[in-house]
Design a protein with these regions (language model features):
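Protruding loop/beta-arch "assembly-hinge" segments enriched in small, turn-prone residues
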Residues: 1-40, 282-325
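Intrinsically disordered, low-complexity linear regions
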Residues: 2-33, 45-50, 136-169
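Extended oligomerization regions of viral-like shell subunits
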Residues: 180-275
Length: 325
């Protein structure tokens, strides 16, 4: 074989401008985007709530000359929050740092690693606290057969389902019970995938657009200001077992009213109270720190955050479970 050849003129080395890691896009996560995040100075505290019915009764009366006006009042109670502290760390030993080839940067990668793990934990906690049955005033389950009370046809049934009517009924339910209009729709990715191909929805835009249906189009079609798609993915296997993955939010949907800006006398389906004490005063932001573990000749990279997801007004939410097959 003639020399030199292709193998003798080059020794394989690590590329310094590329590496491969599966970092989910931060836009996949919605836990800090759906409901207002309230930074709080104390780990636990209370907030005031008003009795809804007191504000809806018609009790004003005609006033005769020389008489007192009709009067009344409202009941006031308190709710409470208690922020759980979540933390995760990775130790980076000195030998690994000293021996790392470019483009590897073990300390920087450790920061990304622990931050993403906490982002996933926050997302899964949001699902547990807000995106399930028994949380909101109205729960509807999607079924493949004939629906009974509390059920509707799954939106993936393109022949029999009517997602537009289902959403209109849900909007009317929230408005009729609270006087507030729904302004946010959260869809699991599988639900969004089914909706954007539903013939009823495609038919509404076929003469005005040839594009694939987007969240903005759904918002306009449903007259709901915000439509959000939850795309976070989680591993469902234990370490060392066969890899398995799934969408964190499942085949579910939530319609709700969210306060655009939290404040006094401002109803909202939910709030997230974020304790600033563990994140450098940054509220929902994940706080990271790096400190020496001399006993194991390593630097520890640690991430920490503290929050409590609270349903504030259950009647401002309408939830669908198993809404697609």
């Amino acid at each position: 074989m003639p020399q030199p050849n292709i193998n003798s003129v080059h020794v394989d080395a690590i590329l310094t401008n590329i590496s491969v890691a599966y970092l989910q896009n931060q836009d996949n996560f919605i836990a800090d985007k759906v409901f207002p995040v309230i930074p709080v100075d104390k780990k636990s505290d209370k907030y005031f709530t008003y009795t809804k019915n007191d504000w809806f009764r018609d009790e004003a009366q005609r006033r005769a000359p020389g008489t007192e006006s009709a009067g009344g009042g409202y009941n006031l109670s308190t709710g409470s929050y208690s922020a759980d502290v979540w933390a995760f760390h990775k130790d980076v030993d000195d030998q690994t740092v000293a021996n790392a080839d470019a483009p590897l940067n073990p300390l920087r990668e450790a920061t990304e690693f622990v931050t993403r793990r906490l982002m996933l934990r926050r997302e899964l906690q949001w699902v547990s606290d807000f995106f399930g049955t028994g949380v909101w005033a109205d729960d509807v389950t999607g079924v493949s057969g004939a629906p009974s009370s509390g059920e509707t046809k799954q939106w993936s049934d393109y022949t029999s389902s009517d997602p537009i009517s289902d959403l209109e009924a849900a909007k009317a339910e929230i408005l009729g019970n609270t006087g507030m209009e729904a302004n946010t729709l959260v869809l699991g990715y599988d639900v969004f995938k089914s909706l954007k191909n539903h013939p009823d929805l495609v038919d509404r835009i076929k003469y005005t657009s040839s594009q694939t249906i987007t969240t903005d189009m759904l918002a306009a079609m449903f007259d709901i200001p915000r439509v959000m798609v939850a795309k976070a993915v989680k591993a469902t296997n234990n370490e060392g077992a066969t890899e398995a993955y799934g969408f964190a939010h499942g085949k579910k949907a939530l319609l709700c009213h969210v306060a655009p800006q939290p404040g006094l006398l401002t109803p909202s389906a939910g709030y997230t109270f974020a304790w600033t004490g563990v994140s450098g005063g940054l509220g929902a932001t994940i706080g990271t720190s790096q400190f020496r573990m001399e006993s194991i000749k390593s630097d520890r990279v640690e991430a920490e955050m503290a929050f409590d997801n609270k349903v504030i007004s259950a009647d401002l939410g309408y939830f669908w479970n198993s809404i697609v097959a």
